[in-house]
């Protein structure tokens, strides 16, 4: 077992994990943060995207021991303290950017990272290119793209830019 310490959604966490434990397993099984989904186990679907030190990472590709000393944010920790939803989450709700919802946490975490890297004025082409690592089996992506564009603009108006 390996002892790791990290910050998850602003809270210090210490855990003893098998060195082969994936970050997604630590989050879901040990910390009960089940918003991070496992869709493929092969790093293709993007349902497991979280932020590590502010950057989007597929949690199924990262060993938990590699997150030792780092800050991890999951969909559960995305909204500001006291706020019911992050502006990107609100945009997905308002623009019907989900159907079954399984891919939604990963889409939203990827979208927030996209805004941080590329800014608030995102073209449809840029959004679609950036979503290549995220799969949705239910939609044609149009409402997801619209949700991300609206969420990016909403983030510009908030202090979560």
Whereabouts are the PLM-identified features?
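Signature of N-terminal electron-transfer/Fe-S-associated modules in redox systems
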Residues: 1-161
């Amino acid at each position: 077992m390996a002892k790791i310490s990290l910050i998850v959604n602003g809270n210090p966490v210490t855990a003893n994990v098998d060195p082969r434990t994936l970050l997604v397993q630590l989050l879901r099984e040990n910390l009960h943060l089940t918003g991070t989904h496992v869709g493929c186990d092969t790093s293709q679907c993007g349902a497991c995207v979280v932020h590590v030190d502010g950057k989007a990472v597929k949690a199924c590709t990262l060993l938990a021991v590699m997150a030792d000393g780092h800050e991890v944010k999951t969909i559960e920790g995305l909204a500001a303290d006291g706020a019911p939803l992050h502006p990107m989450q609100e945009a997905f709700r308002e623009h019907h950017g989900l159907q079954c919802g399984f891919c939604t946490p990963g889409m939203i975490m990827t979208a927030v990272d996209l805004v941080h890297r590329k800014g608030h004025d995102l073209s449809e082409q840029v959004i679609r290119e950036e979503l290549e690592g995220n799969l949705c089996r239910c939609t044609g992506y149009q409402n997801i793209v619209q949700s991300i564009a609206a969420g990016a603009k909403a983030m510009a108006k908030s202090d979560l830019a």
